[in-house]
A protein has these predicted regions:
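Acidic-histidine catalytic/liganding microenvironments
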Residues: 4, 8, 91, 125
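Conserved core segment of the aminotransferase class I/II
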Residues: 6-78, 87
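Residue-level recognition of strand-loop junctions within catalytic nucleotide-signaling folds
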Residues: 34-35, 65, 108-110, 149-151
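Conserved glycine-rich beta-strand-loop-beta hairpin in the small C-terminal domain of fold type I
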Residues: 57, 61, 76-85, 96-109, ...
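A short linear hydrophobic-aromatic micro-motif
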Residues: 92-96, 129-134
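PLP-dependent enzyme catalytic core of the Aspartate aminotransferase-like
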Residues: 121-129, 136-173
């Protein structure tokens, strides 16, 4: 939208290394916007959030200078997200679209029941922890967020997804 005529002055674009480069927990990101918006944003961010650690800044700098290191992650996550969609969509009443990138699946379980109950059920029955979509805002009810980046080994990720699938197939409202 910022490239459209007259929109740069009204657009704030936020980039996160956490999701885009797998830097979860390092709290590195940046904003692109016009100066009249940036000045108050910068002052607020420094006062509220503080500064990013030196180690995180160095890691981000290296990542930007050597983008090839991300290729191995892209390949692994591409395989995982395609397999996750295949496994989870095999459950009647469960719907998941292929994530555009990254390691998070947004799973619609609304046809099966309450997402809070289902998340607790999966922890107990499948022994896999998932996030209740309700924690991500009003539109998250009926959804689960599943992280595909927990293990290095693909087979452990796929085994966890299969355990989720098997538990959901047994789930009764």
């Amino acid at each position: 939208p910022a490239a459209l005529p007259g929109m740069f002055e009204r657009t704030v674009t936020v980039f996160s290394f956490s999701k885009g480069m797998g830097f979860s927990g390092l709290r590195v990101g940046y904003i692109v916007c016009c100066d009249s918006i940036m000045d108050p944003l910068f002052a607020t961010a420094v006062a509220v959030v503080g500064a990013t650690s030196t180690a995180a800044q160095q890691a981000a700098t290296v990542a930007l200078q050597h983008p090839g290191f991300m290729k191995q992650f892209e390949t692994a996550y591409d395989k995982r997200r395609h397999r996750a969609v295949e496994i989870l969509n095999s459950v009647p009443g469960v719907h998941v679209m292929l994530p555009e990138s990254g390691f998070l699946c947004w799973v619609d379980v609304s046809e099966l029941g309450d997402s809070t109950e289902i998340a607790a059920y999966l922890t107990a029955e499948a022994r896999v922890s998932v996030n209740d979509g309700k924690n991500y805002g009003q539109g998250g009810a009926g959804h689960l967020r599943i992280v595909l980046g927990v293990y290095r080994d693909d087979e452990r990720v796929f085994a966890a997804l299969e355990a989720v699938r098997d538990a959901l197939l047994r789930y009764k409202k």
